[in-house]
Amino acid sequence: MRTPHAIVLGGGGLLGEAWMSALLAGLEDSKEFDARRSACYVGTSAGSIVAASLAAGLEPGARLGRLPDLAVPSADGSEERETAFSSAFAAAAKLAGAAATPLAPLAFASTAAGGAMLRRAALRGIPEGRRSLEELGRQVELSGVSWDGRLRIVAVERESGRRVVFGAPGAPDVPVSSAVQASCAIPGYFRPVKAHGRTYVDGGLWSPTNIDVAEVDGGQHVLCLNPTGALRPASRALTGAIGTFSRAVTSAEALLLKNRGAIVTTINPDAHSAAAMGGNLMDARPRQAVIEAGLAQGRRLAAEEQRSAA
């Protein structure tokens, strides 16, 4: 696989971040693929961490030994973490109806005004989170990343329910570290980011990947990694509905880019990666297994590309 013009990195909690970093590291087995040379990065929630590290010039594998400050593994806290993670998608999941009504999430994402109203209403019912993401912000600052024109970080403005794309022209002026914290601020669990009199929370509330933010022209390649695309209806009702929502919305947004002539490749976790991830993407315990599965998936994809090009 050649280096794409744009890399889009979706939400997916602790394990999604690990899978994306590992998969990109595996893809770099291909001599023509260098994730640090793309012209555009779009990061949502956990994907904002990976996007910022790539924009900083760090190799994808550089993050595999580090645990981002998103969760503290403990046996008695897993249910609380899962509930907090799921709440960010609850409104969309209810509309998806656990795959019974596949067109509902498309309507939810594509009608900006209606979608913003639904998000605003849902956020009103969720108390502000208390856990800090300041350590994550410090990690981002230490990477030396800056707004160099390539990076886009997605969050949602809590007051209006609308999407905000930090790094884009006209967006609020905040440091990259603050933008990443905002994009990762799962409502009800993490403390939201406040800037310029507004409050910002997890960008995954708008879309699992926000692939339509990618700035591309006809013929340019967009690579989208969607960690939540592997959550299936066969699992518990809510996580299955999240997976349905994730795949449907990402497909709808990708179609917008394809209509502009872009070439879009979306990668979801394969069967081995999905099995390693399970249904709780904030549980740190299977992280090493997810890394190994992601690396293997990336290397397999790189090998397949090399064989097809031969």
Question: What does each model-found stretch correspond to?
Answer:
Residues 1-44, 49-310:
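Patatin-like phospholipase
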